[in-house]
């Protein structure tokens, strides 16, 4: 930690990633690195990929004396059959407008932010509703509406995502499943990622896959090696 004290910590989705920096190259090692040195304050924990990881995160935080708020226990969010988005915590219920970012997985990120903003900053409900319609999130299912790439894409819809681990491939795949148009995937990755597992998420979901090189990046996997 670079701070002696903090107001709060938000823990996002933890999954297999950045093993090259870890001595324990497993999900347990990732969880340890992300939770073992958190300062004592307030910790808000997002929904995890599965219950097993969620339990491991909770166990890893047992010795931390912070106030802890877990998705599914202390706050929750869901989309009803009539598409209403409902948020709940011990302060009360909120019916939320549709966010201006793509992907239902973002509802979990939004819920963690709402929990923190209500508990720590006492943000008003109307400001929360306004805020989730004005989110600026770069490189996460971000629709590109202008610029050089959009000119190349023409009338096609262009969406970019910088996801590079298995959990992000699940997220992208789930979003693709919700689309009514054919999806063509263009992919470039670094050498140290789980390429086969990442790509397996898109089997049977996309119209085509195009592998490209990452320009001026020594750590990128070449398109020829990727295809093999």
How should these model regions be labeled?
Residues 49-69, 153-160, 166, 199-228:
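C-terminal helical cap/extension that packs against the catalytic core
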Residues 23, 54, 109, 169, ...:
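Alpha-helix N-cap/helix-start motif
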Residues 15, 19-24, 148, 213-226:
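Flexible, gly/pro- and Lys/Arg-enriched active-site loops
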């Amino acid at each position: 930690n670079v701070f002696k004290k903090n107001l709060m910590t938000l823990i996002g989705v933890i999954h297999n990633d950045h093993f090259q920096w870890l001595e324990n190259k497993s999900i347990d090692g990732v969880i340890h690195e992300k939770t073992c040195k958190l300062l004592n304050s307030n910790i808000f924990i997002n929904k995890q990929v599965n219950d097993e990881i969620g339990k491991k995160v909770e166990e890893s935080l047992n010795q931390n004396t912070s106030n802890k708020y877990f998705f599914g226990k202390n706050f929750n969010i869901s989309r009803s059959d009539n598409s209403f988005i409902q948020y709940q915590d011990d302060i009360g219920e909120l019916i939320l407008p549709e966010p201006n970012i793509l992907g239902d997985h973002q509802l979990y990120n939004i819920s963690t932010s709402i929990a923190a903003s209500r508990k720590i900053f006492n943000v008003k409900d109307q400001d929360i509703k306004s805020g989730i319609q004005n989110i600026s999130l770069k490189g996460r299912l971000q629709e590109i509406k202008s610029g050089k790439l959009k000119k190349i894409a023409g009338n096609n819809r262009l969406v970019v995502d910088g996801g590079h681990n298995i959990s992000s491939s699940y997220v992208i795949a789930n979003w693709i499943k919700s689309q009514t148009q054919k999806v063509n995937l263009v992919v470039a990755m670094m050498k140290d990622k789980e390429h086969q597992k990442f790509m397996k998420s898109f089997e049977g979901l996309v119209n085509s896959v195009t592998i490209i090189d990452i320009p001026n990046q020594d750590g990128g996997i070449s398109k020829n090696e990727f295809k093999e």
